[in-house]
Amino acid sequence: MLPHLFTETHTSDSKAGELTPEWADRLGLPQGIAVAVGALDAHMGAVGASVAPGILTRIMGTSTCDIMVAGKDEVGGRCIKGICGQVDGSVLPGFIGFEAGQSAFGDIYAWFRKMLAWTLKDIPGGEARQKVLDGMLVELTREAQDMEPSEDGVVALDWMNGRRTPDADQNVKG
């Protein structure tokens, strides 16, 4: 381990320390405010959504994370196959946190929009261009809903940034 890194790890329910007098003064805050340790964004999103045993929370953005928790006694020594994360205390103290989801979600929509919009780059006036862009995915969604599912149609997988679940593999593409 590099000498400048810490040798201990802490779960997200512990504090790293307290706000120093210098920073309290600079920020206009009282001294002694707790400073949190680092935590995973999706895990803290689940906390904000009131995750609890038996409740699945879905955090959606560039990717998606499906977060659940279970008591240690319920999990025992089992490791859940296919998910990308199972960590003691990663979401709530005293519980095992489970994470699954998609490596690509919102960024697929951004990429798709960019791919479809390249022809619009020469339209003068940002307002007209924006109006077309705003309606594009809405119209494509409407048309897709009218299509009948087919087992011999084109398949697109959400593996643009690798696969988070099932069986995480960040090198797979589809």
Language model features with spans:
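Active-site core segments that coordinate phosphate-bearing ligands/cofactors
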Residues: 1, 10-174
